[in-house]
Amino acid sequence: RNRCSISPVEVILLSGVRNNISHSYLKKQLCDLLNVECLPPDYYAIFKSVTRFSYAEMNDLLDYYKLEKNKNGQKQLNQRGKLLDTKTIRAWKKVFKKNPNLPEAEGVPQGSPISAVLANVYMLKADKQIYEYVSALQGFYMRYSDDFMVVIPNAAPVDFRKHYETICGFITEAGGIEIKAEKTRIFFVENGVIRNCIADVIFSQENGKDLIDFLGFSFDGKEIRLREKTISKYYNRMHRKAVTIFKCSGVTKKGNRINANELYKKYSYKGSAAYQNRKAAINGGKHIEGNLFDYLKASKRIIGDNFVDSITPRHMARIRRFINGKQGKHHK
């Protein structure tokens, strides 16, 4: 939160890719967590269900429902509440395929509710090793899924490679996780000045921007903002929504009416939970989940004065300008 001005700091950002995680290693981590020699029957049943999985190809599902093999077909498929009932699954067994890595005892399907939990269990030993290593250096360690951040104070550039290789060693020791060199970033921060120095550690890489990007935020040594990619995505989606509204003259293919209110609801503060729930309390309506502006508000509250919100101050004017421009073209 505060400017890095006391001592030089090394910041290591790593991004891993889970290839085929080892079933035996995962089972050992579960046993260590539970402090048991063998998994209890209920735990083993869950473990077995996610390691001996079957799956169906998207194209086979599209064929079954007679849908087009494109994004539109996939969208229609996703709109179904339940893809296959038990009776259909039993009759359709030949379409399902077994885990292709089962002979090697590797791989866990992504997307199931338990997958994220097991992924964290898988990393328990590595997390402990990295935490202890970094703590001994009075540093800071954070991991979110496969994205890692390590901050080491009083760091000497001569030690950067040693820190990097040690931490990568802890991660890859588990097996099944590959550290992508092209996604690795190493920075030297001193007196609020950030210097990208990845080329000094991984000779095959070139130094990039002197900007620390992590979990959707960017830090330039003084201020924290949303990443440019996040901001661009927000404006692009807003523009596409506006174009859609005016292209179809405010009526969907199904005959439902849409207007600019939908645009404001999704892409302005008027759609935020804080704004809508305040109206709901007055009008007796139901509460809603909110949008990006709730995220911005929470970011400001948590990060403090160092957080710069570049969207909120000008977004309403930008929406109005875009709508007025489209309306003018629409009526010509």
Question: Model-derived features: where do they sit?
Answer:
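Well-ordered mid-protein domain cores that form the structural environment of catalytic cofactors
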Residues: 1-7
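Conserved polymerase palm-domain catalytic core
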Residues: 7-145, 149-165, 209
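Right-hand nucleic-acid polymerase module
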Residues: 37, 86-112, 121-124, 128, ...
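Conserved catalytic core of nucleotide polymerization and phosphodiester-bond processing enzymes
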Residues: 172
